[in-house]
Regions:
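N-terminal amphipathic/basic leader segments beginning at the initiator methionine
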Residues: 1-43
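Short helix/loop capping segments that flank catalytic or ligand/cofactor-binding pockets
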Residues: 14, 23-25, 74-75, 163, ...
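Short alpha-helical segments and helix-capping/turn motifs at coil-helix boundaries
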Residues: 48-51, 82-86, 143-153
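Glycine-rich phosphate/diphosphate-binding loops that line cofactor/substrate pockets in enzymes
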Residues: 48-64, 89-95
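Short glycine-rich or small-residue beta-strand-to-loop segments that form or flank ligand, phosphate
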Residues: 62-73, 98-104, 162
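Histidine-anchored nucleotide/phosphate-binding helix
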Residues: 73-92
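Short, glycine/charge-rich beta-strand/loop segments that flank catalytic centers
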Residues: 96-106, 131-135
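An acidic, phosphate/nucleotide-engaging active-site surface
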Residues: 109-175
Length: 179
């Protein structure tokens, strides 16, 4: 039996002798009305438990959109343009918006990688920067005395919008979320 399975970024062909195949499990069909950018826009237009983003941000405010770096499979190039449109509808100027790629302990991005992550429109329209552990503001300490340092651009913003994913992590259990 020949099968095509997803592996990495491209499908892989595998051949399994018929006598070794016990069966094939298939997922139930899911009803999907919208996908991709259409679903992102619908979600921004109909938020759960809050008002629309365009009703939260105000003209003159500094807005930072924080997203994952190149090591995470977040489709920021699909998500952030719709977020920008929502922010622009609120009257926020492009000059007051920055996209921060949260590096953690990872290396900085090349300009080409930033374009791949964010798309040309976002990269050319607003400030797109990597977080910098050497440019932080001390916000305080935890109860156990651990310093809480936040990247200056994020700390000084009036509004912070976080975009990310939650996925299995090979030694931490899960990655993303409130990390």
């Amino acid at each position: 039996m020949n099968l095509t399975i997803g592996f990495g970024s491209t499908p892989q062909e595998v051949s399994i002798p018929d006598n070794l195949v016990i069966g094939i499990l298939k997922a139930n069909e899911a009803e999907i009305c919208l996908t991709g950018v259409d679903e992102i826009k619908r979600s921004l237009e109909n938020p759960i438990g809050t008002t629309r983003l365009r009703d939260i941000v105000k003209p003159g405010e500094k807005v930072v959109i924080i997203t994952s770096d190149i090591t995470r499979p977040v489709p920021s190039y699909k998500i952030i343009p719709s977020i920008l449109d929502e922010i622009y509808e609120a009257g926020v100027n492009k000059e007051d918006i920055a996209v921060v790629l949260a590096l953690g302990s990872h290396r900085v991005h090349t300009d080409e990688e930033k374009i791949k992550l964010l798309g040309e429109r976002v990269y050319n329209e607003v400030k797109c920067i990597d977080s910098d552990a050497n440019d932080c503001v001390r916000m305080g300490e935890t109860k156990s005395g651990t310093p809480v340092d936040i990247f200056r651009v994020v700390a000084e913003a009036d509004r912070r919008i976080c975009v990310g994913n939650i996925e299995y992590h090979y030694f931490a259990g899960y990655s993303g979320g409130a990390k």
